[in-house]
Amino acid sequence: MKTAPEIHLRDVQAVYSGPEGRLWELLMGEQIHIGGLQSSMDLAERACIPAGGRGVDLCCCLGAGMRFLLRFRNVAHMSGVDATPTVLALARERAEAEGVTSRVTFVEANVCATGLPGGSFDFVWGEDAWCYVEDKPKLISESTRLLKAGGIVAFTDWMEGSTPMTAEEAKRFLTFMKFPSIFSLAEYTAQLQSNHCEVRAPQDTGRFPKYVPLYLDMIERQLTYDALKIIGFDQALAGALSGEMHFMQSLAEAGKIIQGLIVARKNG
């Protein structure tokens, strides 16, 4: 596991309460994860998310994943947990706009200690967001606590690839992204297994090196004005952000960072 011990929850909250969060939504859409709807559909299919099920989205952000599951998988109810009040306020507004308020519940809490009752959910869901969590072992423990016996943990995340980053590369990447740490597929698998879960086909989706050029094209070719407006027309900052994204692309092409996908079943 690579770590950036100077990064904490308050730093992540600052990102998603300010211009950086709006910039990510500009580039990636409401579904702020690599692959958008295609990625969500793929994860839901692999996890066999059931119609009529009850799920919890840990690090739900704007609630787009919850609304996807309500609309495309016809789940009965989704709970969403996030520690950033700004994004939860927007999530509630968007749930109301899509007419699903009665089928969602939002909880402001640390995802490592949600306060939700144990054994209450058919599945736990996450999309490219657990990389922001400081204590990933506690996150996995909380995820499995929330599940009924036989329940499913299904998530994608930004992970370290099969070729490790150097210490210098990891520090630069984690600092730019405000990730306190980054796990590999093997590390997530080990944590799930130690929490009595059977892990099914952990894999690299292969999307990372294909999608970062798309985001770069949008910020450098099409949405440049929009991006500059979000960051107060600070062209020096825009250049720095572009440079860090090109660096991130080089890591993805080298297999050092990936979008990993994991589906696991709680024993019992």
Model-predicted regions and their roles:
Residues 33-51:
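Conserved alpha-helix/loop element of class I SAM-dependent methyltransferases that forms part
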Residues 180-196:
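Short alpha-helix
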